[in-house]
C-alpha cells in the first residue's frame, strides 16, 4: 500500500536502501541516512512515500522542495526513487511519481526534477519518466574521484 513514510519506517527504508546499494554500488551510509531521514520525515517541504507491506518497503520516493540559488525558481527534486527488483514492472513507481508530481504542484513549485543516475535500468526509467510527462533536460555527468565506489555503474 502506498502511504506516507514516517520515522517508524526508517528501518524498512534502510533495508530497501541496502538492496539498492547492492545493486547500484556500495554507496549507502546507513547511520547517516537514518539520522537524516529521522530529521526530515514529516517536514512540509519533504515528500516521502513508499509501498509498504508486511514484508517491508517495496518501493520508495523521497524528494524535497528548495529554492534555486541562482534562479528565481522553486524546485521539487527527488532524492531517491527505487523499487525492489522483485516488484519492478508493476504500478508502484508510477503511483509514487504521480503522487510526487501532484504534491509538488500543490506546493506551487516552478519545476519538478527526477533523475535516473544509479545505473539501474536508466533507459527504462527515462522512458517511464517521459510517459508520465517529464522531458529530458540537459546532461548529467559524474567524475568518479574514488573509482571503487562506481565500479558497478554503467554511466
Residue ranges and their predicted role:
Residues 54-60, 76:
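Glycine-rich phosphate/pyrophosphate-binding loop shared by adenosine-nucleotide-utilizing enzymes
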Residues 113-124:
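Conserved beta-strand-loop-alpha-helix junction that forms the acyl-donor binding cleft
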Residues 1-8, 147-155:
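Conserved N-terminal entry element of GNAT/NAT acetyltransferase domains
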Residues 1-30:
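Short amphipathic alpha-helix that is part of the acyltransferase structural core
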Residues 26-48, 61-71:
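A conserved beta-strand-loop-helix scaffold within acyl/acetyltransferase catalytic domains
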Residues 79-89:
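A short, internal acetyl-CoA/4′-phosphopantetheine-binding micro-motif in the GNAT/acyltransferase core
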Residues 95-111:
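Conserved acyl-CoA
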Residues 115-117, 135-147:
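Conserved catalytic-core motifs of GNAT/GCN5-like acyltransferases
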Amino acid at each position: 500500500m502506498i502511504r506516507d513514510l514516517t520515522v517508524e519506517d526508517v528501518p524498512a527504508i534502510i533495508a530497501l536502501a541496502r538492496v539498492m546499494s547492492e545493486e547500484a554500488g556500495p554507496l549507502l551510509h546507513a547511520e547517516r541516512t537514518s539520522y537524516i531521514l529521522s530529521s526530515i520525515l514529516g517536514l512540509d517541504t519533504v515528500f516521502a512515500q513508499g509501498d509498504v507491506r508486511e514484508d517491508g518497503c517495496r518501493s520508495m520516493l523521497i524528494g524535497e522542495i528548495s529554492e534555486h540559488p541562482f534562479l528565481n525558481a522553486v524546485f521539487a527534486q527527488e532524492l531517491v526513487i527505487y523499487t525492489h527488483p522483485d516488484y519492478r514492472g508493476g504500478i508502484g513507481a508510477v503511483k509514487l511519481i504521480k503522487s510526487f508530481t501532484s504534491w509538488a504542484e500543490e506546493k506551487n513549485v516552478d519545476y519538478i526534477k527526477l533523475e535516473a543516475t544509479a545505473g539501474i535500468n536508466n533507459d527504462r526509467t527515462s522512458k517511464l519518466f517521459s510517459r508520465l510527462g517529464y522531458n529530458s533536460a540537459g546532461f548529467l555527468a559524474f567524475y568518479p574521484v574514488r573509482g571503487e565506489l562506481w565500479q558497478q555503474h554503467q554511466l
